UniProtKB/Swiss-Prot annotation:
One Pfam family this sequence matches: Iso_dh
Organism: Saccharophagus degradans (strain 2-40 / ATCC 43961 / DSM 17024)
Gene Ontology CC, one term: cytosol
Homology family: Belongs to the isocitrate and isopropylmalate dehydrogenases family. LeuB type 1 subfamily.
Name the UniProt record assigns to this protein: 3-isopropylmalate dehydrogenase
PROSITE patterns assigned to the protein according to its UniProt record, in alphabetical order: IDH_IMDH (PS00470)
Pathway assigned to this chain's UniProt record: Amino-acid biosynthesis; L-leucine biosynthesis; L-leucine from 3-methyl-2-oxobutanoate: step 3/4
Compartment(s) where it occurs, according to its Swiss-Prot or TrEMBL record: Cytoplasm
Sites marked Important for catalysis: Y141, K192
Encoding gene, per UniProt annotation: leuB
HAMAP family: LeuB_type1
Length: 357
């Protein structure tokens, strides 16, 4: 039975890195007989140029009908002056919301071959393997009312609403505990329950879920302390679960512990484990078309796609092992290059990973 994957290369370096991920997926498809079928469509700035909107309804329908979606990146200075309602990034927010992608999985793994790339001492980060589980469709980014209003005294006031319903906390919490069961069985829930009522409820719901997972050790941490601990002693964490805004900030902090954002994949899943997979890094318009972008985050996102949406763990393992083997061989893209290594292009890196499979 075939599995349909929609590719959304997007803007900037997106088309280059998605092309390499597709190449690697074709290699595992040939080896494991997965029956992968690919369709390609537009999102972001390139969709605005063609359709006048960052995500056409036809594209959204195609994504909803697929088994999984693999995206490159969206945005660039060309579209920065547009009204905020039709900016490239709105296409990504819409696809997350319309597909019900409430769980964002952000691994922060330090490859031993790249230990020197981290800004922290090797003894602090070596062996780092954190999974941040971020709630993606609720919280202050989606809460209503929101806006900018004119007060009676003539002053303008900006306002947003931080809101979470029990069911939203429940489902992201269960996702985190399920992930922890497959890892080191530790969950740290991050909130600001000493100040925000919405996160008082968050803490209560997470605590009650933990009763269903007695093997998993649960801890709670205020977000300011969590940010400090991520830098001070990151290896204390296994799975971190948190709301939309806190997760947005903490996952980028965790990303830089690894030394290169060009290595980090992500997954966004819905109730049915259908998902959108994308690298953590942006569209990098300054290097687009030069063949120097690191495709490994997108390739590793493809591995996550095989694992979480297509239930093809062996194929996912094969991709991750191939990435490790290529790094062992000393091949490096520009962003992770160091003295004594061999600098390779985007395409050469993709070729090397595919060849290892």
């Amino acid at each position: 039975m075939s599995k349909k994957i929609v590719l959304l290369p997007g803007d900037g370096i997106g088309p280059e890195i998605v092309a390499e991920a597709k190449k690697v997926l074709e290699a595992v498809d040939a080896k494991f007989k997965l029956g992968l079928k690919f369709e390609e469509d537009l999102i972001g700035g390139c969709a605005i140029d063609v359709h006048g909107v960052p995500l056409a309804q036809s594209t959204l329908d195609r994504c909803k009908a697929a088994d999984a979606v693999l995206m490159g990146s969206v945005g660039g200075p060309k579209w920065d002056a547009l009204d905020s309602n039709i900016r490239p990034e709105k296409g990504l927010l819409k696809i997350r919301y319309e597909m019900g992608l409430y769980a964002n999985l952000r691994p922060a793994i330090l490859y031993p071959q790249l230990a020197d790339a981290s800004s922290l001492k090797p003894e602090i980060v070596s062996g780092l393997d954190i999974l941040i589980v971020r709630e993606l469709t609720g919280g202050i980014y989606f809460g209503e009312p929101r806006g900018i209003r004119l007060l009676d005294n003539g002053e303008r006031q900006g306002y947003n609403t931080y809101v979470y319903a029990e069911h939203e906390i429940e489902r992201i919490g269960r996702t985190a505990f399920e992930m922890a069961m497959k890892r080191d069985k530790k969950v740290c829930s991050v909130d600001k329950a000493n100040v925000l009522e919405a996160t008082v409820l968050w803490r209560e719901v997470i605590q009650s879920i933990s009763k269903d997972y007695p093997e998993v050790e649960l801890s709670h941490m205020y977000v300011d302390n969590a940010a400090m601990q991520l830098v001070r002693a990151p290896k204390q964490f296994d799975v971190v679960v948190t709301g939309n805004m806190f997760g947005d900030i903490l996952s980028d902090t965790a990303a830089m512990l690894t030394g290169s954002i060009g290595m980090l994949p992500s997954a966004s899943l819905n109730q049915d484990s259908k998902g959108l997979y994308e690298p953590v890094h942006g569209s990098a318009p300054d290097i687009a078309g030069q063949g120097v972008a690191n495709p490994l985050a997108t390739i590793l996102s493809a591995a996550m796609m095989l694992r979480y949406s297509l239930n093809e763990a062996a194929a996912a393992d094969a991709i991750e092992a191939a990435v490790g083997a290529v790094l062992d061989d000393g091949l490096r893209s520009a962003d992770i290059f160091s003295e004594g290594m061999k600098k390779v292009s985007t395409q050469e890196m993709g070729d090397a990973v595919a060849a290892k499979i």
